[in-house]
C-alpha cells in the first residue's frame, strides 16, 4: 500500500521563471557579493553579465548530459566566474552566498495551480509527503 508521496520542487510543485529584472538583479547581486569580499572584476556591467551567462551555459553543457549537479564552489569557480580568473579555491569562502543569492534573486518561484489543495488532500488521506530537490 502506498503511504508516501515524494515530489520534485521546481517544475512540479512550483513554476519557475526568469525576467529581465531578475537577470539584472542577480548579476548585481554577484557584483555586490564579490565587492563585499574585496573582489573587483574590472569589467563593466554588460561585460560581466555576458561572461556570467556564458559561464552558466558552459555549466549547463557539463551538467545536462551527466545529470549531475556540482558543489557551489565548483559551479562558480570552474564555470560561472572562470572568465575572471577566479577558481574554486578563490570562490570557496563565498560560493554558498553566491548560490543562495542566485536562487532567490534570479528565479521567480510560485506554486503551480491547485498544488496546495492537492497536498492538503493527500495529507487528509494520511499520506506522508516529501520534497526532493537539488536547490
Region spans (language model):
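Substrate-recognition element of Asp-dependent hydrolases with the DxDx(T/V) motif
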Residues: 94-135
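A short, structure-level motif marking secondary-structure boundaries and short turns
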Residues: 15-16, 61-63, 102-105
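Residues within well-ordered alpha helices
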Residues: 33, 79-80, 121
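A metal-dependent, Asp-based hydrolase signature
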Residues: 45-99
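Glycine-centered loop/turn motif at secondary-structure junctions
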Residues: 38, 85, 123-126
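Active-site neighborhood of HAD-like aspartate-dependent phosphohydrolases
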Residues: 1-50
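Soluble or luminal CAZymes and related metallo-dependent hydrolases
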Residues: 22, 26, 71-72, 107-114
